[in-house]
């Protein structure tokens, strides 16, 4: 039985997450792991968000959180100055830690896309894009429905599953049975979905030329947005970490919200 009064080091959380979604299996451009703070830092209160925005960081400071855990890195591009308004700098000067699981979690078993699959009530049949063949890891998943569905009906299911205000829909094949899914900015996976013979692709941040490719090949595409397809990270992390470390407090930030509204 775990001791609820025992202290917790950031290293313990890091090591657990490294087994869940190995930090070594990520895109070369990415920046994952502990980005602010040290492994020896004591943590008791952990704030979870998609992004370490200024409102999220200020909540962490104001409410006494020790660690901000996010999907997106707080330091992605090199810092050219140390402005106190920069979230990473703000965390550091207030002695807070920040840890990110980005593309390592996107391609992990039970990562973002597997959560997408589960929320739609589907089962994954394979990886859409095996980016890391030695570890058999990659981006996107392929699923087959028990019965065919129309593009509009699938779009409505997607809206409900990912709590989307709106989705963008390109109706290609009208009888959809084989589906590819990928989280976040995933329009580049549409061609992989086409090559796998999928009837539909569900993702986010689809670019204009990617819509045109989909139109030309006749595949249905549903753009559920970057935030809705990845904010699902937060609830999953709270669940697994609370179960593993009951001596700590895990809270989803009230400020982990989409940065824009539809008008």
Which residues fall in each region the model found?
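Active-site catalytic microenvironments in core metabolic enzymes, especially phosphate/sugar-handling
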Residues: 1-263
């Amino acid at each position: 039985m775990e001791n609820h009064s025992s202290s917790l080091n950031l290293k313990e959380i890091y090591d657990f997450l490294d087994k869940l979604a190995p930090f070594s299996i990520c895109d070369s451009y990415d920046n994952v792991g502990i980005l602010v703070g040290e492994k020896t830092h004591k943590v008791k209160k952990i704030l979870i968000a998609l992004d370490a925005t200024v409102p999220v960081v200020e909540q962490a400071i104001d409410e006494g959180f020790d660690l901000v855990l996010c999907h997106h890195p707080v330091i992605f591009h090199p810092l050219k100055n140390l402005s106190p308004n920069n979230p990473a700098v703000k965390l550091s000067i207030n002695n807070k830690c920040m840890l990110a699981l980005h593309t390592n979690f996107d391609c992990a078993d039970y990562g973002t896309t597997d959560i997408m699959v589960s929320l739609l009530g589907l089962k994954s049949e394979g990886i859409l894009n095996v980016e890391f063949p030695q570890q058999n890891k990659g981006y996107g998943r392929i699923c087959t429905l028990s019965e065919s569905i129309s593009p509009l009906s699938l779009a409505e299911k997607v809206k409900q599953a990912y709590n989307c205000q709106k989705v963008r829909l390109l109706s290609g094949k009208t009888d959809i049975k084989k589906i590819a899914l990928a989280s976040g900015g995933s329009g580049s996976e549409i061609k992989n979905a086409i090559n796998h013979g999928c009837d539909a692709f569900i993702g986010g941040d689809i670019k204009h030329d990617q819509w045109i490719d989909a139109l030309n090949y006749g595949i249905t595409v549903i753009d559920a947005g970057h935030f809705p397809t990845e904010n699902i990270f937060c609830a999953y992390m709270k669940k697994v970490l609370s179960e593993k470390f009951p001596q700590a407090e895990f809270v989803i930030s009230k400020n982990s919200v989409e940065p824009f509204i539809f008008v």
